[in-house]
Amino acid sequence: MVMSRIRDTIARPFQNLTALEKVVQWLRLGTTLLIISFGLALTVGPLSSPRTLYMSRLDTYSADITTGLFTVLRESMEQSTSTEENNGVGLTTSELYILTAYTESQIKNVPQYITVSLYGRCDSTYTMVEVFDSEGNMHSVKNSTTKSTCSSIGTDYLFDYREVLESLGLDIILDYAYNKIGSQQAESSAYTTYMRSLKHKKANVLHLLYAVISFQVCMLFFMIWYYYIKGRFMNALKERALVHINSLLSLVVFIGGLISSISLAWVNYTIQSRINTELEAFGFSYHLGVTWFALLWCFAGLISVSCLAWSGLEWCISDNGTSYGGGIDDKFLGYQAGVFTDADLDDETSYSQRYPQRQSTSGEAELMRNSDTMATIRKTSDVDLNSENDANTSLDHGNPTANISNGGKHEPFATREEFELQDIRFRSSNDSEESMQRVIKPSSALQF
């Protein structure tokens, strides 16, 4: 019994829906659940899997940096040493050897790549294994496995690539990359101000993303409540209120979700552009995280579909011409306003107003032209009138004060119109378009 009630309660929001309403319901439910799932993957995922769900990655392979740094230093030294003494020949072999050894020593402890997440970064280095060559000599070779050191800062974390290079001991790269730009101190101050503003913007956008996910959870609750009561009450005020609340929330989620998604993408694209412009010559490369950004764009697409499924359908497509006030619809249960009136009003209304004439059909006209039909009608009316007079006489003997008036209801039909009016009065209610026996559907087809 208890399990049956639980099953009925769970299945209730999915009952009494048309085929189109079921499609809309599953579209709304599916997009809502996916938005919540993707939102949690975007925000909570980097805490548990920072190496997988990262926003960006800075490749710092030692071989690439060695080549890039060596090229930059060689060009710089050739320009500075290209004088009349060496006839512009450039560096000697010994100088090139010294320069190569110097660059290798500078990047000895640099990680192979750095992954940047929402809350921090991970420095990853390939592990080294000792192997023997064919002559029996032991060498250190990089293994395919990596060793990562992760740090979590918080929601206001932003990848400061200059600070990272300085912490890794790559001061030589900073000197050669930024000492040619006017005053180095002025450039550093402008860079610090710019990164501080980006950090503040990124923190605000992340908080907005949290709010969007929270609103989506509220939408899930209101949606279940709405389908739980849909079409089960004569007063649809609560039902329509829930629809408009969810439509408004979907619009807020759409605006906030797009702002947060575009802003996070813009911050990462900005940093990528600056790094590739300033450090690409030194062997650095900056890439965006494929998995995390795929989730981000799917999240943005789903909130757009959800907004169309709620706000679009309810405010742009649905037939909302029906009044959803506190009263019951005039046509509910087949009653039409002004057709059935009070007895007092009937007494004050003329006979022709209460029973308006209608055009007789060809069959009825032919029937009334038949003299036998009219004779039968008159005969029947006379019999009814005599029976009523006898009843009045009997009542007068039993109770002298009793006085029952026929009120003109059983008078003979003098004209064809009176016969037709009598026929109208005794017609079946099934002939009316507003019959009480028709099937009642409180919700219309275009109200989702």
UniProtKB/Swiss-Prot annotation:
<feature type="transmembrane region" description="Helical">
    <location>
        <begin position="205"/>
        <end position="225"/>
    </location>
</feature>
<feature type="topological domain" description="Cytoplasmic">
    <location>
        <begin position="1"/>
        <end position="28"/>
    </location>
</feature>
<feature type="transmembrane region" description="Helical">
    <location>
        <begin position="288"/>
        <end position="308"/>
    </location>
</feature>
<dbReference type="GO" id="GO:0051285">
    <property type="term" value="C:cell cortex of cell tip"/>
</dbReference>
<feature type="compositionally biased region" description="Polar residues">
    <location>
        <begin position="383"/>
        <end position="406"/>
    </location>
</feature>
<dbReference type="Pfam" id="PF06687">
    <property type="entry name" value="SUR7"/>
</dbReference>
<keyword id="KW-0812">Transmembrane</keyword>
<feature type="topological domain" description="Extracellular">
    <location>
        <begin position="50"/>
        <end position="204"/>
    </location>
</feature>
<keyword id="KW-0472">Membrane</keyword>
<dbReference type="InterPro" id="IPR009571">
    <property type="entry name" value="SUR7/Rim9-like_fungi"/>
</dbReference>
<feature type="topological domain" description="Cytoplasmic">
    <location>
        <begin position="226"/>
        <end position="246"/>
    </location>
</feature>
<comment type="function">
    <text>May be involved in cell wall organization and biogenesis.</text>
</comment>
<protein>
    <recommendedName>
        <fullName>Protein ECM7</fullName>
    </recommendedName>
</protein>
<feature type="compositionally biased region" description="Polar residues">
    <location>
        <begin position="351"/>
        <end position="363"/>
    </location>
</feature>
<dbReference type="GO" id="GO:0006816">
    <property type="term" value="P:calcium ion transport"/>
</dbReference>
<dbReference type="GO" id="GO:0000324">
    <property type="term" value="C:fungal-type vacuole"/>
</dbReference>
<feature type="region of interest" description="Disordered">
    <location>
        <begin position="427"/>
        <end position="448"/>
    </location>
</feature>
<feature type="topological domain" description="Extracellular">
    <location>
        <begin position="268"/>
        <end position="287"/>
    </location>
</feature>
<keyword id="KW-0862">Zinc</keyword>
<dbReference type="GO" id="GO:0005886">
    <property type="term" value="C:plasma membrane"/>
</dbReference>
<dbReference type="InterPro" id="IPR052413">
    <property type="entry name" value="SUR7_domain"/>
</dbReference>
<keyword id="KW-0961">Cell wall biogenesis/degradation</keyword>
<feature type="transmembrane region" description="Helical">
    <location>
        <begin position="29"/>
        <end position="49"/>
    </location>
</feature>
<dbReference type="GO" id="GO:0031505">
    <property type="term" value="P:fungal-type cell wall organization"/>
</dbReference>
<feature type="region of interest" description="Disordered">
    <location>
        <begin position="351"/>
        <end position="411"/>
    </location>
</feature>
<feature type="transmembrane region" description="Helical">
    <location>
        <begin position="247"/>
        <end position="267"/>
    </location>
</feature>
<keyword id="KW-1133">Transmembrane helix</keyword>
<feature type="topological domain" description="Cytoplasmic">
    <location>
        <begin position="309"/>
        <end position="448"/>
    </location>
</feature>
